[in-house]
UniProtKB/Swiss-Prot annotation:
Its cofactor is heme b. SUPFAM superfamilies: a domain/subunit of cytochrome bc1 complex (Ubiquinol-cytochrome c reductase), Transmembrane di-heme cytochromes. GO terms for biological process: mitochondrial electron transport, ubiquinol to cytochrome c. The gene is MT-CYB. This is Cytochrome b. A ubiquinone binds at residue 201. It comes from Lonchophylla chocoana.
Length: 379
């Protein structure tokens, strides 16, 4: 008799995705981050759902409702800090996942890659709107500064900003709609994740060598289910440690002051995972130019498959490209540091240099290096 998991209309979809899925036998731990992102998303939706039961999206009570969650709700502080630090874990896994894709040439699966970029934008939008909800000083001023960037769009900019605000400043209407969108977007992200997996399973997984692995496949279960569970345990241990020992390590002290439109904080900055993009934005003295650079800092990933000039897919056997890749990582870490610093010498010039280098590596140096490597191998 055929197993029910192979015949049942619903179960056979799950079976072909997580049980009998043919998977390359050589996948390293860098392939764990996809499933870790799934766990992060589940944790965020669950904790977010329980937080939404106690939160009130009103400028008069939002800050107090978050305080109430932390002080009066049973284990409310765990929910709140799991959600806040869960977002940090989400972005750590997200950036490592994208980095893996760049290093091993996974971007040649263009549909999967482009859905991934769409997912990155959706998660960033969700995180930004979530940061506004506690209605602290950094929530309010972060929302004001970032939404104001849209006013740089020619002709329609000012009207667009007022339309998003629901008035002439960030106020009650803005908070209410941000809460609505923050609640809705994770479910859209979940749907996009399914499309992402659908396209991935059309082609099968890439592997560290970048060589087709059709002759050497193993079933996903039990090999990679066990491997993924180890990843889950490591990540959840790290998250729990962060939540239970230093929950405010990655937050901003300014957000413990209720929002005050009459008092601007000395340094307005987003959460750490947006600092690299914020540094790129600030490195251009023109408003519209800065906004374009900000969008392109992520959108540039969409051009990467077009600029793949190497005869090899993965960087595993390409030492020159590897050096460039790690230079790119160092550049991003530098940008993250600069994004948290005040706008003064020498931070401005370091930020501008790192921004130029970031785009240079991805758009010019990597394709040229690949051509040089092809020549060295007489290909």
């Amino acid at each position: 008799m055929t197993n029910i998991r192979k015949t049942h209309p619903l179960l056979k979809i799950l079976n072909s995705s997580f049980v009998d899925l043919p998977t390359p036998s050589s996948l390293s731990s860098w392939w764990n981050f996809g499933s870790l992102l799934g766990v992060c998303l589940a944790v965020q939706i669950l904790t977010g759902l329980f937080l939404a039961m106690h939160y009130t999206a009103d400028t008069a009570t939002a800050f107090d409702s978050v305080t109430h969650i932390c002080r009066d709700v049973n284990y409310g502080w765990v929910l709140r800090y799991m959600h806040a630090n869960g977002a940090s874990m989400f972005f750590i896994c997200l950036y490592l996942h994208v980095g893996r894709g760049l290093y091993y040439g996974s971007y040649t699966y263009t549909e999967t890659w482009n859905i991934g970029i769409l997912l990155l934008f959706a998660v960033m939008a969700t995180a930004f709107m979530g940061y506004v909800l506690p209605w602290g000083q950094m929530s309010f001023w972060g929302a004001t500064v970032i939404t104001n960037l849209l006013s740089a769009i020619p002709y329609i900019g000012t009207e667009l900003v007022q339309w998003i605000w629901g008035g002439f400043s960030v106020d009650k209407a803005t908070l209410t709609r941000f809460f609505a969108f923050h609640f809705l977007l994770p479910f859209i992200v979940t749907a996009l994740v399914m499309v992402h997996l659908l396209f991935l399973h059309e082609t099968g997984s890439n592997n560290p060598t970048g060589i087709p692995s059709d002759p050497d496949m193993i079933p996903f279960h039990p090999y990679y289910t066990i491997k993924d569970i180890l990843g889950f345990l490591i990540m959840l241990t790290a998250l729990s440690t962060l939540v239970l020992f230093s929950p405010d390590l990655l937050g901003d002290p300014d957000n413990y002051t209720p929002a005050n439109p009459l008092n601007t904080p000395p340094h307005i900055k987003p959460e750490w995972y947006f600092l690299f993009a914020y540094a790129i934005l600030r490195s251009i003295p023109n408003k519209l130019g800065g906004v374009l650079a900000l969008v392109l800092s992520i959108l540039v990933l969409a051009i990467v498959p077009v600029l793949h000039t190497s005869k090899q897919r993965s960087m595993m056997f390409r030492p020159l490209s590897q050096c460039l890749f790690w230079l790119l990582v160092a550049t991003l870490l530098t940008l993250t540091w600069i994004g948290g610093q005040p706008v003064e010498y020498p931070y401005v010039i370091i930020g501008q240099t790192a921004s130029v280098l970031y785009f240079m590596i991805l758009l010019v140096l990597m394709p040229l290096t690949s051509i040089v490597e092809n020549k060295l191998l007489k290909w």
